[in-house]
């Protein structure tokens, strides 16, 4: 009889991470994976093509829960996920990262005494005002298997008294980047024709976090910083526009150094990232992906959970004027994190 894993995701970055593990799960004939999409972030780019390109199945369940307060969203997700878990009766629940979907999946499973596996466990920004930080901490403290991307994440858990079920497996975003690079190589003409650009003459910029966009003054400070940065370094700014900031960018549309783009697919983002001179972002994931492509990053936040990128000199906070001396390698693994995770899951099921 096959063992059953329920995977809970709610945002595009979580699908990218889950895809790496789903591709490994498919190699096991005795494991069945069922995917729940909470709907936390609706993304029009997540069509059938999105799942085909990532080589993963479409979600069996779509809860369509989004666009409400953190508490309302998490509460609705708890109820919706519980209904699915009662029906599917999984042997283990797999959650990713630090979204409301992560926390809701972990809490629902914990209350039903279903084992929980948390991918990207142990990360800490130590900023309790970030909703993601609360989600990370609470999820870790109810999880049974904690898959850490870094040794620092393992140390963070130990400092909180969590030592059982902790595994240092490397960063599965490294797995995802290897997969993306192979995909881009096979479809290179498509990307070259789509983007008329010269390598190195632009910076890739993204802003999407609520703390960056809810306050117009903060957003304007970030845009002013980016403008000065581009002028100082003689770089264009390629800026895919998140739906949250469409109104905020109107007064910048006539600025010659900003090139506003429609939202990009995952593979389009990876292609532009590989050609950029710099990355400016408030995204945690893009900080790492910049490193995987060996592109210097400036994080548009006052802290980051990926402290290795700061210590290694590949990343710096926008409030700091200089990088640390650059080291060639960060211990994020070699792209086999998903394989290690599924082997551990298989042995525990």
Predicted segments, located by residue:
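Conserved nucleotide-sugar phosphate-binding/catalytic loop shared by glycosyltransferases and other
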Residues: 31-73
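Donor-nucleotide binding loops and adjacent catalytic segments primarily
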Residues: 40, 48, 185-275
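A donor-sugar binding/catalytic signature common to diverse glycosyltransferases
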Residues: 95-96, 146, 270-309
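Active-site and donor-binding regions of nucleotide-sugar-utilizing enzymes
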Residues: 3-11, 15-24, 50, 62-161
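A nucleotide-sugar donor-handling region in carbohydrate enzymes
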Residues: 41-45, 64, 142-218
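Short acidic-hydrophobic, aromatic-tinged amphipathic segments that line or gate anion-handling sites
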Residues: 63-64, 148, 167, 260-262, ...
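A generic structural motif
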Residues: 28-34, 233-237
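Leloir-type glycosyltransferase catalytic cores
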Residues: 51, 152, 316-349
């Amino acid at each position: 009889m096959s063992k059953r894993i329920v995977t809970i995701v709610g945002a595009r970055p979580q699908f990218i991470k889950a895809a790496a593990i789903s591709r490994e799960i498919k190699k096991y004939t005795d494991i069945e994976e069922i995917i729940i999409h909470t709907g936390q972030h609706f993304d029009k780019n997540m069509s059938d093509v999105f799942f085909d390109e990532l080589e993963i199945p479409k979600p069996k369940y779509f809860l369509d829960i989004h666009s409400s307060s953190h508490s309302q969203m998490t509460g609705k997700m708890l109820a919706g996920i519980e209904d699915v878990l009662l029906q599917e009766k999984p042997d283990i629940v797999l959650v990713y990262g630090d979204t409301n979907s992560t926390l809701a999946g972990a809490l629902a499973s914990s209350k039903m005494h279903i084992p929980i596996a948390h991918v990207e466990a142990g990360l800490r920004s130590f900023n309790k005002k970030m909703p993601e930080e609360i989600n990370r901490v609470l999820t870790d403290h109810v999880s049974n298997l904690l898959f850490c991307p870094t040794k620092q994440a393992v140390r963070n858990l130990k400092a909180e008294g969590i030592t059982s079920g902790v595994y240092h497996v490397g960063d599965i975003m490294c797995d995802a980047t290897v997969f993306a690079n192979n995909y881009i190589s096979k479809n290179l003409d498509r990307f070259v024709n789509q983007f008329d650009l010269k390598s190195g003459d632009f910076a890739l910029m993204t802003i999407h976090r609520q703390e960056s966009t809810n306050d117009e003054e903060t957003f304007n400070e970030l845009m002013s910083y980016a403008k000065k940065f581009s002028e100082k370094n003689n770089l264009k700014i390629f800026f895919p526009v998140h739906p949250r900031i469409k109104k905020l960018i109107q007064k910048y549309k006539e600025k010659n150094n900003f090139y506003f783009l429609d939202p990009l697919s995952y593979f389009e983002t990876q292609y532009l990232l590989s050609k950029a001179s710099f990355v400016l972002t408030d995204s945690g994931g893009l900080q790492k992906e910049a490193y995987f492509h060996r592109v210097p990053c400036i994080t548009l936040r006052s802290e980051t959970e990926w402290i290795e990128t700061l210590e290694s000199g590949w990343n710096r906070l926008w409030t700091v004027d200089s990088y640390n001396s650059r080291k060639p390698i960060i211990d994020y693994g070699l792209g086999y994190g998903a394989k290690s995770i599924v082997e551990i899951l298989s042995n525990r099921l």
